[in-house]
Regions:
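Conserved class I S-adenosyl-L-methionine
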Residues: 40-87, 101, 105, 189-220
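A short acidic, Gly/Pro-enriched loop at the edge of an enzyme's catalytic core
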Residues: 151-159
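Acceptor-substrate binding/catalytic loop of class I
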Residues: 227-242
């Protein structure tokens, strides 16, 4: 989520609601039974995204502590759960892990889990949560760029999650998808999210800047804005079709692309006042997801793709 001081200007827009980031950084290691690795991206460039996410790491969980995100997370986990590996010894990865929300769920489910984030402060938050975790020895923490993760072995993971739109934040989404294909096992599954290009159109229309609208439609690129200009970074948005093509070019079989969420409940959180109401809304989301056209109205897209067996 963006700073409260965010102000969209010119051809830029403030995109929101994410759990993720990318890049190469130094880190401090510690904690017992937890392996740490530092992965260099090979690119020495100004990394605004890293600076932003390092700064907000300590308050990150609090930013997303409200009924909307409880609904969002319940919806997400129900989409992930059918793809959990049947083999208890399988390895999983959480790319752009942030403070570890999804990786910790995988770890709790019994899977050896690799947590990857470009922001060292985020990885430190994960480390703190793991210190009292009885499954900590099954966790590997990596500070690195999802575009280039040479220390992740080929054909390693049965399930790879990339939640919070790391594909939109990273410098090269195709390279990131190629990396995912490399380290996903045959018949393994990747579930990833990205910013929806169609949802961002309203911002440009609201600004009344036709030239900016034309540029955005042409490129699909916008920016994450904060009060501190040194923390502003570029975002790549996708349509359902372009996100599917991204994964198909890497060699994946696309199983689904859905919007998340389709129902704009964030505009009226009173709809989420009870667990019973949340359950009803989750069921409605599942029903709407059956229609591919529904994805167009969601702020974010979620793709599920499988790496096929090579015959």
């Amino acid at each position: 989520m963006a700073d409260r001081n965010v102000r969209p200007t010119g051809t830029q827009t403030a995109m929101a609601d994410r759990n993720v980031r990318h890049a190469d950084v130094d880190w401090r290691c510690g904690g017992r039974g937890i392996f740490y690795r530092r992965v260099m991206s090979g690119h020495r460039r100004k990394d605004s995204s890293r600076r932003y996410h390092d700064r907000v790491a300590r308050q990150y969980d609090a930013i997303y502590d409200d009924p909307y995100w409880e609904f969002h997370d319940e919806l997400t986990w129900r989409m992930v759960r059918p793809h959990l590996p049947r083999d208890a010894s399988a390895a999983c990865a959480d790319l752009g892990c942030g403070t570890g929300k999804w990786g910790l769920k995988l770890l709790k489910s019994g899977f050896a889990t690799t947590f990857v984030d470009h922001a060292a402060a985020m990885i430190e938050q994960v480390r703190g949560k793991l210190e009292s975790n009885p499954r900590a020895r099954k966790a590997t923490l990596v500070v690195g760029d999802i575009v280039h993760l040479p220390e992740l072995a080929d054909e390693r993971f049965a399930l790879v999650l990339a939640m919070g739109d790391p594909l939109s934040i990273c410098s090269d989404a195709q390279a990131a998808a190629n990396e995912m294909f490399r380290f996903t096992k045959a018949d393994g599954v990747v579930i990833a999210t990205a910013d929806n290009k169609l949802a961002a159109l309203d911002h440009y229309v609201g600004r009344g800047n036709l030239e900016a609208l034309e540029e955005f439609v042409r490129t699909g690129r916008t920016r994450w804005l904060t009060a501190d200009e040194s923390e502003r970074f570029e975002l790549t948005t996708f349509t359902p079709a372009s996100l599917a093509k991204l994964f198909e070019r890497s060699g994946f079989e696309v199983l689904s692309v859905v919007g998340k969420p389709v129902i704009p409940v964030r505009g009226n959180k009173m709809l989420l006042e009870s667990a019973e109401a949340t359950e009803r809304l989750v069921k409605l989301e599942s029903e709407l997801a059956r229609d591919p056209a529904a994805a167009g109205r969601a702020a974010h897209l979620q793709i599920t793709a499988r790496k096929p067996f090579v015959t």
